[in-house]
């Protein structure tokens, strides 16, 4: 898994706003990413403070090398491959230009997972502890699921990230009080006006951040005006908090009436321009105008800051207030970091154990195939008389024996998942049990995980002589003939002791003609682990 992106920590707002990806564009970007031959899964998180892409390679790492095979890729080769993949991701989403490259951050493997978890826990947010990021991440995951770009690995990482965020908010007080970009904006307003009571605040926009800001403004005693392109949304928000809704056409008049303007829309263009502010200044008769722009892309043209008696602040200007907030939450942030580290370690353990799944599946298939072959040999001979109940009991006994035989080896193998020498242990195990060399039809016996033996449903075979047919010739199997002698006992074929392969040819004794084990593994979500 890799991560490529930028945030308020690596790029100024003028860079972030150029690269912001709106929700309506996310499916297109996700499709472009997963169309790349090297990318199997993708997740895009775009907020006012970050644009981040998480991706997982289409092909997982190969199984441990067999003796005499080519050596595994070196750390240098893996690094080059990861760098190439990161470069491809950056280019596909428009982050590959020279002007942007210096602002990019990247992580690979467990470091990428750790970063994802820290973001979900709001530890990487401009305002540590802010709750909005968890909702934004849920929305990004929902879009990726809808676009079918989340698979086993990245899908699980995303799911765990949400759990991590919830756990941090439940087990720590990192989100206590008012912690969000909106709350920081109101704190700034309080610094400008010692008391907001009696002052008029204009809120441009009616989204989540605008709603949060409106409640704080009203609580502080400010008179609130709400302007939004959608009159209905403006009216709904104003009604909820006791403000005054105005149509978009009254934006300039509202700027004239306001002491402070807070803007938070999703517009791709400036909604407050220097010309609008110049006209408003004349009508304001020298009153200072304070504007706080918490939107990305920005709503207010930064050129208005050059006008007399006009003071503009954007999200990057809120950093000093944020720093004070972080200091007060240092202890809770440390507790949150410990939770994130614990969850990241657990995810890494799952990843390592998952890589062992093909070997464990192969070992169980190998063991089961041997037991099945021996039991079916007996069922075609001395135990032909067994009924349905007895055959079902044998099937259960095979399962129980397989589980008991392999419980200790598989438990210890999983415990070795984080051992640097695990590849050597796995290779030895596959060599000792000839897991890679097992005939496909023997491996197919793994389907007995369902607990079936041929004949367990059909019941005991009816002797051929009882159906009016002659008994098997002396040269038939079971009468001392060579292994490949034919014909095989017709009763055995008719009653399922021998399964038929495609084309009607009976399989070897003790072999189950069932689905390809690779397909079964794939259906179980384990292929390529």
From Swiss-Prot:
Protein name in UniProt: Glutamyl-tRNA reductase
Pathway: Porphyrin-containing compound metabolism; protoporphyrin-IX biosynthesis; 5-aminolevulinate from L-glutamyl-tRNA(Glu): step 1/2
PANTHER family associated with the record: GLUTAMYL-TRNA REDUCTASE (PTHR43013:SF1)
Signal peptide boundaries: none
Pro residues compositional bias, start-end: 62-73
Biased composition (Low complexity): 464-475
Functional note: Catalyzes the NADPH-dependent reduction of glutamyl-tRNA(Glu) to glutamate 1-semialdehyde (GSA).
């Amino acid at each position: 898994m890799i991560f490529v992106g930028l945030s308020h920590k690596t790029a100024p707002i003028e860079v972030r706003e150029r690269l912001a990806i709106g929700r309506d564009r996310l499916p297109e970007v996700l499709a472009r990413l997963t169309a790349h031959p090297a990318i199997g899964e993708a997740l895009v998180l775009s907020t006012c403070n970050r644009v981040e892409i998480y991706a997982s390679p289409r092909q997982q790492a190969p199984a441990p090398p067999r003796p005499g095979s080519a050596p595994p890729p070196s750390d240098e080769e893996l690094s080059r491959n990861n760098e190439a993949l990161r470069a491809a991701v950056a280019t596909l989403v428009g982050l590959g230009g020279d002007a942007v490259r210096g602002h990019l951050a990247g992580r690979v493997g467990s470091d990428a997972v750790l970063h994802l978890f820290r973001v979900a826990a709001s530890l990487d947010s401009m305002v540590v502890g802010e709750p909005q990021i968890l909702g934004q991440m849920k929305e990004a995951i929902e879009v990726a699921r809808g676009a079918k770009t989340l698979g086993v690995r990245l899908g699980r990482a995303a799911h765990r990230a949400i759990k991590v965020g919830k756990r941090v908010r439940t087990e720590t007080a990192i989100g206590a009080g008012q912690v969000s970009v909106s709350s920081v904006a109101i704190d700034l307003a309080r610094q400008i006006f010692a008391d907001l009571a009696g002052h008029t605040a204009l809120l441009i926009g009616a989204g989540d951040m605008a709603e949060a800001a409106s409640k704080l403004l009203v609580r502080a005693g400010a008179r609130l005006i709400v302007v939004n392109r959608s009159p209905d949304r403006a009216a709904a928000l104003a009604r909820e908090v006791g403000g005054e809704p105005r149509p978009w056409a009254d934006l300039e008049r509202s700027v004239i009436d306001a002491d402070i303007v807070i803007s938070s829309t999703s517009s791709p263009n400036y909604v407050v321009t220097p010309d609008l502010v110049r006209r408003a200044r004349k009508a304001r008769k020298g009153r200072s105008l304070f504007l706080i722009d918490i939107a990305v892309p920005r709503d207010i043209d930064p050129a208005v800051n050059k006008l007399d008696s006009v003071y503009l602040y954007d999200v990057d200007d809120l950093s000093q207030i944020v720093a004070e907030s972080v200091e007060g939450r240092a202890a809770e942030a440390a507790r949150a970091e410990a939770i994130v580290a614990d969850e990241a370690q657990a995810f890494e353990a799952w990843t390592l154990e998952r890589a062992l799944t093909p070997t464990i599946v192969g070992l169980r298939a190998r063991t089961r195939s041997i037991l099945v072959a021996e039991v079916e040999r007996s069922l075609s001979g001395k135990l032909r008389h067994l009924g349905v109940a007895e055959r079902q009991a044998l099937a259960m006994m095979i399962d129980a024996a397989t589980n008991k035989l392999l419980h200790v080896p598989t438990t210890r193998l999983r415990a070795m998942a984080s051992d640097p020498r695990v590849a050597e242990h796995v290779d030895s195990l596959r060599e000792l049990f000839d897991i890679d060399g097992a005939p496909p039809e023997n491996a197919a016996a793994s389907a007995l995980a369902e607990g079936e033996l041929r004949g367990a449903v059909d019941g005991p075979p009816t002797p051929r002589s009882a159906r009016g047919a002659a008994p098997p010739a002396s040269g038939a199997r079971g009468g001392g003939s060579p292994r490949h002698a034919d014909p095989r006992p017709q009763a055995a074929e008719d009653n399922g002791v021998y399964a038929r392969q495609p084309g009607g040819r009976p399989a070897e004794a003790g072999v189950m003609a069932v689905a390809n084990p690779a397909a079964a593994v794939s259906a179980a979500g384990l292929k390529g682990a």
